[in-house]
A protein has these predicted regions:
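Conserved pre-motif I regulatory segment
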Residues: 17-20, 27, 39, 45, ...
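Flexible loop/turn segments at secondary-structure boundaries
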Residues: 53, 108-109, 272-276, 303-305
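Conserved phosphate/pyrophosphate-binding and hydrolysis machinery centered on Walker-type P-loop NTPases
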Residues: 14-18, 40, 176-180, 238, ...
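Glycine-rich phosphate-binding loop of nucleotide-binding enzymes
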Residues: 247-250, 254, 282, 286-298
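Accessory nucleic-acid engagement/destabilization modules that flank
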Residues: 1-13, 17-230
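Walker A/P-loop
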Residues: 259-285
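Conserved Walker A/P-loop ATP-binding site and its immediately adjacent core
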Residues: 277, 291-308
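Extended hydrophobic secondary-structure segments that form protein cores and membrane-embedded regions
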Residues: 44-45, 98-103, 265-271, 295-297
């Protein structure tokens, strides 16, 4: 059996299906490590293009035909078929991975429609899904992943899902399901980003980005925090409002230095320097914790528009 491809450059150089699948698995797993589901992410990345392991899809890739072929459903269907008769933890893992795979080109769907119908299961059983399924699975398990590896990965992924569910500290079903939906969204986003990143790097002849280590991230926060401090220190102190803004900003910095992570509120009148005071707090907290991200949310409309 000839080696299947995932992408082809204008120069007719090709990226193998196996290389793309492994690269996406690595990137997706690395991203999902931060929420404790590294193997869930790796499994989703590895299976996401299972449907490309079919002669019809390969012909489309080589010849750039206009035929529309569904290559996303094969991996979605396989992971579900392998686990739907097992324990609830296996079924939950399979649902999460299945939905991320099936939607990685179309956008995340609902498990259940407003009418209470499970449209995703209808998709698994659709005629278009069936056409490519058997051939794709057989070829994929020969070229990209063995059954033994798949079994081991699924077991590790289930262990992560069990730990995740136990860590959702609430007895309220609505909140628990919301938490799981956030995991679903995270996995979906990680998979799409990993897929696009590997595709872009290959097509542009670039190396895949290396994961940022703790030391590198700490150096970034140190630089950013110092930049914010220098920027704020350069403000003139001409008027009483300048002194008050500085006082508020210093209090925010003090809170960041004396406290650990948590939820904090800042109540300051309009014009009191909330934006920069909050940024200063945020940078120092991120520096202390060597955080992975800082998210900044701003109003859709300006403050003056909201108050008018």
């Amino acid at each position: 059996m000839k080696e299947f491809i995932a992408h082809i450059r204008e120069s007719r150089e090709v990226q193998s299906h196996q290389d793309h699948s492994r690269n996406v698995a690595k990137l997706c797993g690395e991203a999902c490590k931060s929420i404790g589901v590294e193997h869930v992410g790796y499994l989703a990345g590895l299976l996401h293009d299972m449907g490309k392991a079919h002669e019809k899809v390969q012909n489309h890739l080589w010849n750039q035909t206009s035929e529309k072929l569904n290559h996303a459903t094969a991996g979605m269907r396989w992971i579900w078929n392998e686990n739907k008769q097992k324990k609830p933890s296996y079924k939950l893992m399979a649902q999460i991975v299945s939905m991320a795979i099936g939607c990685h080109h179309s956008g995340l769907d609902n498990f259940i429609s407003p009418k209470g119908e499970e449209d995703w299961e209808k998709r698994l059983a659709s005629e278009t899904a069936q056409q490519l399924y058997e051939g794709s699975v057989k070829a994929f398990l020969e070229q990209c992943m063995s059954v033994e590896e798949a079994t081991e990965l699924m077991h590790k992924a289930v262990t992560e899902v069990i730990t995740l569910v136990k860590g959702i500290n609430t007895e309220e079903a609505t909140l628990a399901f919301f938490a799981l939906s956030m995991v679903q969204r995270f996995l979906f986003g990680a998979l799409v980003d990993a897929d696009w990143t590997d595709t872009k790097c290959y097509m542009n002849g670039e190396k895949l980005p290396e994961p940022v280590c703790d030391q590198q991230r700490q150096e970034v926060w140190n630089r950013l925090s110092e930049s914010v401090e220098q920027y704020i220190a350069a403000f003139p102190q001409k008027y009483a409002i300048d002194a008050e803004r500085t006082r508020i900003s210093n209090l925010c910095l003090q809170v960041a230095e004396q406290n650990d992570r948590g939820i904090y509120r800042l109540y300051v009148p309009t014009g009191g320097g909330k934006t920069l005071a909050g940024l200063r707090f945020c940078m120092r907290m991120a520096q202390k914790q060597n955080a992975q991200h800082v998210f900044y949310f701003s109003p859709y409309k300006s403050i003056t528009t909201q108050n008018s």
